[in-house]
C-alpha cells in the first residue's frame, strides 16, 4: 500500500474518496460489533472503522493489533453517523471504512504511558526518546522549531543575508568556557576544538566582502550544565558590514515582528525598549530584567545615610549604597519578613531594614533611629500609601543590586504578584568593555575580546580601561537573555591594545588570533552582529520549562545522552591511532 494522505488532513471534503493511510495505533475500542481504531501520524488522528460485514479479514486482523503498532490501511472516507462527530479534532466529522489492513510492525508493552497527563520521569523519557518524541507536546515543539527557523531563513534571505557554513574543526582559543577538543590523527600531539561560536569566521567573512552573513550554527561548550544550558546548542548567528548599533536593532526587531506574526500570528510592538546596563542594574538588579513584574529598586542612600547605626556608617565610608523595594498593598507577616531576611543572608547580605505604612504611621525594624523628618522623606520619596511596605539593604553597589535583583523575583513569587501576560523584549546597552575578576585577579572581557569600545572611550584604554564602555548589546525576553552582539573591532592596533589589557601576550595573540589580526591589515570594513539562542527562544515561546523540551536529542545535566550512552569509552586501538593515553583521576582508579 502506498500512502495517499496524512491522517490529520482528511475532512468532509474527502467524503467518498478511497484513501491509503499509514501510522500508529493510538487507541482501540470495541463497540456494537465494530472495532474502532484511532490512527495517528504527525499530522493528527483519524478514526478507522472495521466492520466484519465489509471485510471479515480486516476485522480479524484489527482484533489482534495493540497500541503503538504500525499499520497501513485502505478504505473509503465517510461521514460519521449523526451525533457521533468529535468537534475536538479536525477529522471529527469523518471516519474511514476500512477494506484492507496491513500490519507493518508490532510494539512491545510501553515503558511508560505516552498519553498520561501525569508527569513522567525525565530519565525514562530521555532513555526512550523515540517514544517520548511521539507525544503531542514534543512533536508540536519540534515542528514549531522547524517552522520558526524556516521563517527566520526566509526573512534573512529576503533582506540580503547569505547563509554560509563555518568549520566545526577549529583552533582552540580557550578564553571563555572550556573547549571540546579533538585529537588529530595525522598531526600527533595537535588538537582541533569544536566552536563555542563562529565569531572569528564571521568576522573573516566580513573582511572577505560578503556584507551580510547568517547561519543557524551549532555551538559547543564544555561547561557545567543547568536547566538553561546544553553542551551543544543552536544559535542564530549574524554579521553585517558598514553598520552601527541602530542597524542591528532595526533588523532584529523587524525579524521578530515578521517571524512571530508568520509563525504564531502574534503582533509585537517595535522598537523594543532600551536600558543601559547601569540603569538596568540600578532599577532591576539584573542585566536581564523580567519586565512582566513592575517591582523596581529604589535608592534611599541620601535619606538613611546619617542614621547612627554602625553598619550604615561603615557602608557609607566605603562608598556603599542603601537600596530597597517597595511592596504596594502588601504588609508582610513576621514569618514573611523572616523569609526575606533569611534569603538576604543566604546571599551574603547583612540583613534587611523593613518599614510598613498604615493609618498615617510608619513602623520599622529600626523605628527608634528614625525621626519624623526621615519618616516624612521616606513616605514622600517612596510614594507610600496606607497598606504599603518597604525593605532595604546596605552594602557595596555591586552586592546590593545583585541581591535585590534576585529578591525582586523571589518576593514576586512569595506574594503571588500579578505577572503581565505577553512578550516583553528589551535591549540592554552600554556595557562596560572590561570587568575585574576577583578570583583570577585580572581584567577580563565583559563579553568577548573582539567587542569595540565606544569611540569616545578609546583614549581610556591607555589610562583607565575599567571605565571604557562597549558598543555592545544584549537582547532580553521575559527575564531571559536571548543573546548578545556588538560592533566589532576592525583595526589591528585597537585589537592588539585590547589583547594587551586582557593579559594576552603578542606571542599568544599571534598564535591564537594571528589570522584575524593579519586579515585586519587587508581592508577590514567596520562590522558588527549578534548571536541569538534558538533553543532559549523556542523554550520561551512554547512555555517549556527546560531546553530539553525543545531539542530532539538533548543531553542530561551531567552531559550524557541516555538514549545512546554517549560519552562512552572507545576501543584502545582508536586511542592509539590518535596518540592518546587515558590517565584516570584518582577516584576512577579506586572504583576500578
UniProtKB/Swiss-Prot annotation:
Instruction: Tell me the residue numbers annotated for binding L-aspartate.
Output: 175, 221, 447, 488
Name a single GO cellular component: cytoplasm
Annotated keywords: Aminoacyl-tRNA synthetase, ATP-binding, Cytoplasm, Ligase, Nucleotide-binding, Protein biosynthesis
Chief subcellular location equals cytoplasm
Q: What is its EC number?
A: 6.1.1.23
User: Which Pfam family, just one, is annotated for this protein?
Assistant: tRNA-synt_2
Q: In which compartments does the protein localize?
A: Cytoplasm
At which positions is ATP bound? 221-223, 230, 481, 533-536
Gene3D superfamilies listed in its UniProt record: Bira Bifunctional Protein, Domain 2, GAD-like domain, Nucleic acid-binding proteins
Q: Does the record's keyword annotation contain Manganese?
A: no
**What EC class does the entry list?**
ligase
Carries keyword Flavoprotein?
Answer: no
Annotated site (Important for tRNA non-discrimination): 31, 83
Q: Where is this region: Aspartate?
A: 199-202
Annotated GO molecular function terms are: aspartate-tRNA ligase activity; aspartate-tRNA(Asn) ligase activity; ATP binding; nucleic acid binding
**Can you state the subunit structure given in the record?**
Homodimer.
The entry sums up its family as follows: Belongs to the class-II aminoacyl-tRNA synthetase family. Type 1 subfamily.
Name of this protein: Aspartate--tRNA(Asp/Asn) ligase
Amino acid at each position: 500500500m502506498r500512502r495517499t494522505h496524512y491522517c490529520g488532513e482528511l475532512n468532509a471534503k474527502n467524503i467518498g474518496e478511497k484513501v491509503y493511510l499509514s501510522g500508529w495505533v493510538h487507541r482501540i475500542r470495541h463497540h456494537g460489533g465494530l472495532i474502532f481504531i484511532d490512527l495517528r501520524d504527525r499530522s493528527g488522528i483519524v478514526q478507522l472503522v472495521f466492520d466484519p460485514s465489509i471485510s471479515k479479514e480486516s476485522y480479524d486482523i484489527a482484533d489482534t493489533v495493540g497500541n503503538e503498532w504500525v499499520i497501513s490501511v485502505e478504505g473509503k472516507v465517510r461521514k460519521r453517523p449523526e451525533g457521533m462527530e468529535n468537534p475536538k479534532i479536525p477529522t471529527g466529522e469523518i471516519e474511514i471504512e476500512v477494506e484492507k489492513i496491513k500490519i507493518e510492525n508490532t510494539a512491545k508493552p510501553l515503558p511508560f504511558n505516552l498519553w498520561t497527563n501525569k508527569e513522567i520521569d525525565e530519565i525514562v523519557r530521555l532513555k526512550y526518546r523515540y517514544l517520548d518524541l511521539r507525544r503531542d507536546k514534543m512533536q508540536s515543539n519540534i515542528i514549531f522549531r522547524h517552522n520558526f527557523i524556516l521563517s527566520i531563513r526566509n526573512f534573512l534571505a529576503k533582506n540580503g543575508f547569505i547563509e554560509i557554513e563555518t568549520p566545526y574543526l577549529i583552533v582552540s582559543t580557550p578564553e571563555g568556557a572550556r573547549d571540546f577538543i579533538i585529537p588529530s590523527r595525522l598531526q600527533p600531539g595537535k588538537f582541533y576544538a569544536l566552536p563555542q561560536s563562529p565569531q572569528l569566521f564571521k568576522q573573516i567573512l566580513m573582511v572577505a566582502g560578503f556584507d551580510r552573513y547568517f547561519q543557524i550554527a551549532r555551538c559547543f561548550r564544555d561547561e557545567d550544565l543547568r536547566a538553561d544550558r546544553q553542551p551543544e546548542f543552536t544559535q542564530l548567528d549574524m554579521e553585517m558590514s558598514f553598520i552601527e548599533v541602530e542597524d542591528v536593532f532595526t533588523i532584529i526587531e523587524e525579524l521578530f515582528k515578521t517571524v512571530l506574526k508568520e509563525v504564531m500570528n502574534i503582533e509585537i510592538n517595535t522598537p523594543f525598549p532600551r536600558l543601559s546596563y547601569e540603569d538596568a542594574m540600578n532599577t532591576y538588579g539584573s542585566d536581564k530584567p523580567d519586565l512582566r513584574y513592575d517591582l523596581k529598586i529604589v535608592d534611599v542612600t541620601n535619606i538613611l545615610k546619617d542614621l547612627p547605626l554602625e553598619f550604615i556608617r561603615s557602608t557609607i565610608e566605603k562608598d556603599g549604597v542603601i537600596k530597597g523595594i517597595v511592596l504596594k498593598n502588601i504588609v508582610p507577616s513576621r514569618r514573611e519578613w523572616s523569609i526575606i531576611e533569611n534569603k538576604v543572608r543566604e546571599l551574603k547580605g547583612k540583613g534587611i531594614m523593613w518599614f510598613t505604612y498604615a493609618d498615617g504611621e510608619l513602623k520599622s525594624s529600626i523605628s527608634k533611629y528614625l525621626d519624623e523628618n526621615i519618616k516624612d522623606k521616606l513616605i514622600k520619596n517612596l510614594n507610600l500609601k496606607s497598606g504599603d511596605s518597604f525593605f532595604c539593604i546596605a552594602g557595596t553597589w555591586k552586592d546590593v543590586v545583585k541581591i535585590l535583583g534576585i529578591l525582586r523575583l523571589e518576593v514576586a513569587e512569595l506574594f503571588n504578584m500579578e505577572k503581565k501576560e505577553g512578550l516583553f523584549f528589551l535591549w540592554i546597552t552600554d556595557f562596560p568593555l572590561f570587568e575585574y575578576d576577583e578570583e583570577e585577579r585580572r581584567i577580563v572581557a565583559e563579553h568577548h575580546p573582539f567587542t569595540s569600545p565606544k569611540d569616545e572611550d578609546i583614549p581610556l584604554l591607555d589610562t583607565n580601561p575599567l571605565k571604557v564602555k562597549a558598543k555592545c548589546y544584549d537582547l532580553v525576553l521575559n527575564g531571559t537573555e536571548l543573546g548578545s552582539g556588538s560592533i566589532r573591532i576592525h583595526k589591528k592596533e585597537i585589537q592588539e591594545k585590547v589583547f594587551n589589557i586582557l593579559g594576552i601576550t603578542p606571542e599568544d595573540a599571534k598564535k591564537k588570533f594571528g589570522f584575524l589580526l593579519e586579515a585586519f591589515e587587508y581592508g577590514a570594513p567596520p562590522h558588527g552582529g549578534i548571536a541569538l539562542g534558538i533553543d532559549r527562544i523556542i523554550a520561551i515561546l512554547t512555555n517549556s520549562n527546560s531546553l530539553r523540551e525543545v531539542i530532539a536529542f538533548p543531553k542530561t545535566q551531567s552531559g550524557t545522552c541516555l538514549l545512546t550512552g554517549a560519552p562512552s569509552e572507545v576501543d584502545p586501538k582508536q586511542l592509539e591511532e590518535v596518540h592518546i593515553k587515558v590517565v584516570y583521576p584518582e577516584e576512577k582508579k579506586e572504583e576500578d
